[in-house]
Amino acid sequence: GDVYKRQAIKQTLQSQIRKYPATCGIKVNTSYNSSTGEITVNAALKSSEGGEYDLVYVLVTDGLTASGGNENSYDYTVKAISNNYLSMSTDGRFTVDANQEHTAATFSISNAKNLNPATSRVVVYALRKVDDAYMVDNITECSINGSIDYLYND
C-alpha cells in the first residue's frame, strides 16, 4: 500500500543517489491554486553528458510521526505521485544532447485542496536509463508555490 510505496521510494532514492553521480540538473517552478486544488509544475532538465531521461513528480507534506518508543521522527506523506515513479513513461521520456536543456515537462496535480504551503512541497526527480535499468539521476524539491533553479552536484 501507500506506506510500502513511500518506504520503497525513499530507499530507492537514497541508495541510487549514492551510487551514481548526477549527470543532470533540474529546474522547477510551481504555482498552487488553492481554490481549485490544482498545482501546476513546470520542470526543466539540463544534462552534462546527454541521454534518455524522464521526470517524475511527488507531492509531499511534512509532519512529525511517532516511530517506536517515544521519539518523534521527521517524516513526510506522499499525497500524489506520477505513474512513472520507478520506470520511464512511454510518452513523457525524452532524449537530450550533452549540455542541452529540455523544458517541455509540465505536470498538473489535482485534488490538492487545503494544503499548507509551509509544509507542502513538490519533489521532482530525473530517471536516467543506464544499462537497461532506470536510475535516479538527480532530485530536487520546491515549495508548492515557488521556484528553484539548477543546482549541480560538483
Locations of regions flagged by a protein language model:
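Short, conserved sequence motifs used for protein processing/export or organelle targeting and
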Residues: G1-D154
